[in-house]
Amino acid sequence: MYRASGIQYEHSDRVRGLASGGIGAMHRLAQHTGLVTALDAHVALLKQHLPYHESDHVLGIAYNVLCGGTCLQDIELRRQDEVYLDALGAQRIPDPTTAGDFCRRFDEADIEALQAAINETRVRVWRAQPAEFFDEAVIDADGTVVETTGECKEGMDIAYNGLWGYHPLLVSLATRRSRCS
């Protein structure tokens, strides 16, 4: 069995660790590629931007997922994490209730506007690539059964494995891990 001995630990009160250490880099990427600006330009759901813009809500939800969050309520864990907030350069982020209210404002046109902001940014990133970037493309397609308990989910049915769910198909550029629209 395990018999660790002679181990000593030191720590400092100034040590600040973050399990999702790359979240600051992800936010810098969103800024550098123009995604933040594109989200604010295309998605218009808020009458006032006090204190949050549309990009703050969209990216807050995305960052929650990147940090292992599985539901909007997990945003509260991020809100209480001082190191997470510092990594993003934020004093505060929208709470889960506000994020839910934001999501409920979307209609079909708003979803298309959100997708337009993402696509505009994707095209800008692709155009910045050198010519050899486009020498080879491998397209990958895969599907999965997504379990749901929603009673009104369009296309929901009982799957081969006995789960109630739906079957999205994801097509991506395998060499670049980029989703094809």
Language model feature labels by segment:
Residues 1-181:
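Dynamic "connector" segments at or just before major functional cores
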